[in-house]
Amino acid sequence: SGRHLCHAMLLPRADAQALLPQFEREGKLERNGASIQRRGKAAVVTQSNPRFLNAEDQTSLDGAEICVDLALLDPATEIAVMRGAVVEHQKYQGRHVFGAGINLTHLYEGRSPFLWYLGRDLGPVNKLYRGLARPESPPEQDSIEKPWIAVVDGFAIGGHCQMLLAIDL
């Protein structure tokens, strides 16, 4: 059913749970498309697709969701921060950009499957808003939540603007 799907998509990913001990020890982790670093009691998640102005696509979504999960699962983290990495584009070179939404190059080339949108909206974006579900109870009754702050350098277009609506501050 729809409720079961929504609940399942809010559960922490198995690969994030497997990486949690490493993140707890080292305080940082890099994945394809994102990284996470603990700074004091804050976890900073940085979305990174520098060639495409940090646009979201099939290659960056998994890494971003893993980092969101880690920020929510980490017992030493009390607040989470989302930002974009430094980009390569000539006009913005050397500057952080929050994100350009969906990767329009991949969309044009037909490399953005329809189900990607569902996975993005029910996965990492929903987790920013609702937190992580627990397997034994519905998320509206018991979830792992932390406040999120967005650091918006440059711009947030399309899906990145949508992401801002799910973030607390």
Question: What spans do the regions from the language model cover?
Answer:
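Gly/Ser-rich catalytic serine loop of serine hydrolases
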Residues: 150-161
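Conserved CoA-thioester-binding segment of acyl-CoA-metabolizing enzymes
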Residues: 2-87, 92
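Gly/Pro- and small hydrophobic-enriched strand-loop and loop-to-helix capping segments
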Residues: 154, 167-169
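A structural preference for short, pocket-lining loop segments at secondary-structure junctions
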Residues: 40, 45-46, 63-133, 137-144, ...
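Short N-terminal micro-motifs specific to bacterial/archaeal maturation
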Residues: 52-55, 98, 155
